[in-house]
Amino acid sequence: MTSRGRARASDRRARGAVVASGKIDFTDAGCFELPYAPVAEALLPEGPWKVVEGGVCAAKGFKVAGYKAGLRAKGTRADCALIVADEDATCAGIFTTNIMCAAPVTYCKKQLAGKPTARALLINAAQANAATGDQGAADAQATAEELSKSLGVAEEDILLMSTGVIGKRIKLDKLMPAIPILSANVESSTAAANAAATAICTTDLVRKTVAIEVQIGGKTVCMGGMAKGSGMIHPNMATMLGVVTCDADVTPEVWRNITSRAGAASFNQISVDGDTSTNDSLVCFASGKAGNAKITSVDSAEGKLLEQALTAVCRGLAKAIAWDGEGATCLIECNVSGAADDEDARVIARSVVCSSLAKAAIFGHDPNWGRLACAAGYAAPVKNRFDQNDLKLSLGPHQLMDKGQPLDFDAVAASRYLKEVTGVHGTCVVDISVGNGSGRGQAWGCDLSYDYVKINAEYTT
């Protein structure tokens, strides 16, 4: 290739893999190079669904695109994504509980409070647009207005997400010219879905996508999701963005209810480092294109099955985020049983996966039952405190405690279990029973390694 040819190739990469025809090449390795591991698929709970291809394009009625606008300080990876519904889609969202919420979070909450449908979601990486004051809000408004013009849809049908460095405003000089290109290139393909899932990532090591189909009311309903997140992950929404598309026909009230419950049982049950971010958002769309009879009750058989499917997708994505925790060598799954109710069980499970001492012990292959029991004991807020004499605790196949006291277990074998799990980036299972109640709960986290400190000492958030 001549020097001029190399320059032209380089220029194409710099412009986000747009070829001469104006089409984005979603297979361009320079922009969409983030590797994929089928973690979310592998971590899906069992159920009456099957995994399919397509990511957020698996559901009927949606088109997507990813693009490199030049928002990142370095590197060639794409940095913005667009999801567009063919028609008004029922929409629900849950957002960060951090008081310092970002401008796009405030914008989305206002939009969804005004109407239960949306047409498009624009996501940018690199700049979080958090702690940016009135100008940050104006920037969000400006991007929504530009997207509204490009797509020919009402501004109130636009939603926004941002992720990246807190305190940094969006580079409008880069993003605004990219919006018409994104709008012109949305398509319903696996390649486009993968490109979008890659574009939204920051410190993630893998892109996170999953899609399933399930029979509801005699019709095939498809549901796909993508998420990003690796650090600043903590219950009640963390530095994670999640998007789910679904083609079920469902009322806004039912969709809001099951989105809230699915989020509570998934994304709000993960922790990497105990930091709750400014930007966390989960937005779920339902196009109604599956042809099923409209689901009008959460208590109907169809409503329950739809909730199970949405929870499964959200759990697969949430667990993939914890698996990909910064510096992590394993996923930690804590299962709690015997609590007074499910919420108490969830609180206890969250407490265990949030414990820095427990996480460090697992990284060091130390079957330290004391740290695990301690974390269960200080869990708060719980409505009903358990009796310490009822505590049973197991690490994988090794029971470490019974009736609140340590057992004479094989410490070498238990340590070997941890070494084997971390050696293959597998799942370390912690089972805890706190009594005879009916409450059950799960939470997911990851171990705490030297690399976590290194990554966050070198990366500005």
Swiss-Prot record:
Q: What Pfam families does the database record attribute to this sequence?
A: ArgJ (PF01960)
Pathway(s) annotated for this protein in UniProt: Amino-acid biosynthesis; L-arginine biosynthesis; L-ornithine and N-acetyl-L-glutamate from L-glutamate and N(2)-acetyl-L-ornithine (cyclic): step 1/1; Amino-acid biosynthesis; L-arginine biosynthesis; N(2)-acetyl-L-ornithine from L-glutamate: step 1/4
Catalyzed reaction equations: N(2)-acetyl-L-ornithine + L-glutamate = N-acetyl-L-glutamate + L-ornithine; L-glutamate + acetyl-CoA = N-acetyl-L-glutamate + CoA + H(+)
EC number assigned by the record: 2.3.1.35, 2.3.1.1
GO cellular component, as recorded: chloroplast
Active-site residues, as the UniProt record annotates them:
T239 (nucleophile)
Q: Does the keyword Coiled coil apply?
A: no
Task: Indicate where this protein resides in the cell.
Answer: Plastid, Chloroplast
Residues carrying the site annotation Involved in the stabilization of negative charge on the oxyanion by the formation of the oxyanion hole: T163, G164
Per the UniProt record, the site (Cleavage) maps to A238, T239
Give this protein's Gene Ontology molecular function annotations: glutamate N-acetyltransferase activity; L-glutamate N-acetyltransferase activity
What are the entry keywords?
Answer: Acyltransferase, Amino-acid biosynthesis, Arginine biosynthesis, Autocatalytic cleavage, Chloroplast, Multifunctional enzyme, Plastid, Transferase
Chain sites annotated for binding substrate: T202, K228, T239, E326, N456, T461
A biological-process GO annotation: L-arginine biosynthetic process
Q: Does the keyword Chloroplast apply?
A: yes
Write down the InterPro entries for this protein, in alphabetical order.
Arg_biosynth_ArgJ, ArgJ-like_dom_sf, ArgJ_beta_C
Q: What is its main location?
A: plastid
Q: What else is known?
A: This protein may be expected to contain an N-terminal transit peptide but none has been predicted.
Q: Which family does it belong to?
A: Belongs to the ArgJ family.
Q: How does it assemble?
A: Heterodimer of an alpha and a beta chain.
Q: Which NCBIfam families match?
A: ArgJ, PRK05388.1
Q: What does this protein do?
A: Catalyzes two activities which are involved in the cyclic version of arginine biosynthesis: the synthesis of acetylglutamate from glutamate and acetyl-CoA, and of ornithine by transacetylation between acetylornithine and glutamate.
Q: What is this protein called?
A: Arginine biosynthesis bifunctional protein ArgJ, chloroplastic
According to its UniProt entry, this protein's organism is Ostreococcus lucimarinus (strain CCE9901)
